[in-house]
Amino acid sequence: MSNKKVQSPKEESIAKMLICKVHIGTKNLENKMKRYVYTRAKDGVHIINLAKTYEKLQLAARVIVAVSNPADVVVVSARPFGSRAVLKFAQYTGAQAIAGRWTPGMLTNQIIQKFIEPRLLIVTDPRTDAQSVKESAYANIPVIALCDSDSPLEHVDIAIPCNNKGKESIALMYWLLAQEVLYLKGTIPRSQAWDVMVDMFLWRDPEQFELKNLANEEATPTAPHLADNQYATEAPYDDWNKKDDWNDNANEEWKNPITVDEW
């Protein structure tokens, strides 16, 4: 009989967080983020308490599920590492994703074409997504944010303490959040593991794909290159002057009339 201990969902999620370095904070510490910091390493980096990260993740998922229309939830990421994660989160939960630059006035200026009226806003980083967080305060829209140890908590209603600068950490946090939302909605039972891998939420550099394609093209065998002067030599014409190669009686045969019997 195996003595392997079966991990609870909380232990399994925290183990994944450790692998993706969700607990690694920064050397700077925001005063309001002290409650989420477990300790400080010798190199000055603050270590985030993953137990509180898991609790805030569960709370955020319940708030997202409470919104009746999933399209009223907007997920924002101005940071490139979070662009693929927010798009995948929106794909599986039905939310709206805004990856890249935030157009000023999307929540406050009704004249612009991109004006939206969401009921909930999720941001990847309150610092890089400061414009959207500020506009949500004007429009009275609650905000859920992935907050590092140095992130400002102004106008943030639910802060999920985590490393919001690493691409593995961002991908895992959105994957866990999407998984919990699907569990609460009943889309997938809790007894069943989600068949979507975390790699689907992971950001990939387009330049790496181009370099990989170039390497594959160089490794592909090609036809041997022919020299430019290979076909530049003249064909031999001495044999054309020999009369033996020609039939001298050809002209006389052509002059003979064709009879009907031959047809």
Swiss-Prot record:
GO CC annotations, alphabetized: cytosolic small ribosomal subunit
Keyword flag Ribosomal protein: yes
Signal peptide: none
Superkingdom of this protein's organism: Eukaryota
InterPro entries: Ribosomal_uS2, Ribosomal_uS2_CS, Ribosomal_uS2_euk, Ribosomal_uS2_euk/arc, Ribosomal_uS2_flav_dom_sf
Molecular function per GO: structural constituent of ribosome
Primary location group: cytoplasm
GO biological process: ribosomal small subunit assembly; translation
Location within or outside the cell: Cytoplasm
Listed CDD domains: RPS2
Keywords from the named record: Cytoplasm, Ribonucleoprotein, Ribosomal protein
Family: Belongs to the universal ribosomal protein uS2 family.
Subunit structure: Component of the small ribosomal subunit. Mature ribosomes consist of a small (40S) and a large (60S) subunit. The 40S subunit contains about 33 different proteins and 1 molecule of RNA (18S). The 60S subunit contains about 49 different proteins and 3 molecules of RNA (25S, 5.8S and 5S). Interacts with ribosomal protein S21.
HAMAP family registered for this protein in UniProt: Ribosomal_S2_euk
Name recorded for this polypeptide: Small ribosomal subunit protein uS2
Higher taxonomy: Eukaryota, Sar, Alveolata, Apicomplexa, Aconoidasida
